[in-house]
Amino acid sequence: INTITYDAGNTTINKYATFMESLRNEAKDPSLQCYGIPMLPNNSSTIKYLLVKLQGASQKTITLMLRRNNLYVMGYSDPFNGNCRYHIFNDITGTERTNVENTLCSSSSSRDAKPINYNSLYSTLEKKAEVNSRSQVQLGIQILSSDIGKISGQSSFTDKTEAKFLLVAIQMVSEAARFKYIENQVKTNFNRDFSPNDKILDLEENWGKISTAIHDATNGALPKPLELKNADGTKWIVLRVDEIKPDMGLLNYVNGTCQTT
C-alpha cells in the first residue's frame, strides 16, 4: 500500500493541491470515468486501502487509513512511546478490523491499541465534538496542524478533542478529494480558519446521489433535476453534468457503463 504524505505544518496552496491530486490518483480506478470525472474502483479491487500520513506542527504525525472504494476513514495511527498506536472506529469489525490493525501498525510486537469507542457517522462525530452541526467546527490548515499535536503521542485526550480532529481531517482529506469545491474552499481560505458553508455540508451528504446522477446522465443531461444547496443555503437545482462538474473530484463507484467524456 502506498502512503501519501502531507505536511500541514509546513505547506503552501500548491503543496495542498499536489496532495489532493496524488490522493485522487492513488484512489481512482484508472479505467473508469464519467464525463471526464474519475471514478473510484468497486470493492473488489486489489488495493483496498490507502494510507495518508499527516504531519503537523513540531513534526508530530498521524496516519489515516482510508477505504479505497469510498474514501471512508476507518481509523488512524500515531507514534506512541516508541510503538505504533492504532485507533479504529467501533463500526469496523471482524476481519476488516484485523486488516486495519495490521495495515496501520504492521509489527504485532510493538503496537498499542486505543480504540475509538464510537462510529464514524457525522451525526456521532458531531455529538462527540459537542456541536449541533459540523458547521460549528472550523476547518483550516492551522487547525489541522495543531489538532494533530493534541493527539499524536499524547497519553490521553478527550473524545471531544479526537472527534474534532476527525471532523477536520475527514473533510480536509476525504471530502476535499471527492469534491474540488471543498478543496477550493480550503485553498481560498488557506491562511485562515473557516466554517464549512451549506454547500459543503450538502455536497458531503449527497455524494452517492450526485455520483449516480452523473453516471446515469444522457448527453450531459441528468436523469432528473438534482436539488442541492448553494453556499448561502438557497436551493440549487442542477440539470446538467457541466453545472456540477467543476465541483467534482471523484465519483463514488457506480456499476454499469456511462458516457466517458
UniProtKB/Swiss-Prot annotation:
Expressed in leaves (at protein level). It holds the Pfam family RIP. Keywords: Disulfide bond, Glycoprotein, Hydrolase, Plant defense, Protein synthesis inhibitor, Toxin. Substrate binds at V73, S120, R178. Disulfide bonds join C34-C258, C84-C105. It comes from the Eukaryota. Signal peptide: none annotated. It catalyses: Endohydrolysis of the N-glycosidic bond at one specific adenosine on the 28S rRNA. The active site is at Y72, Y122, E175, R178. The keyword Disulfide bond applies. The keyword Cell cycle does not apply. SUPFAM superfamilies: Ribosome inactivating proteins (RIP) (SSF56371). GO terms for molecular function: rRNA N-glycosylase activity; toxin activity. Its EC number is 3.2.2.22. Belongs to the ribosome-inactivating protein family. Type 1 RIP subfamily. 2 forms exist, PD-L1 and PD-L2, that differ in their post-translational modifications. This is Ribosome-inactivating protein PD-L1/PD-L2.
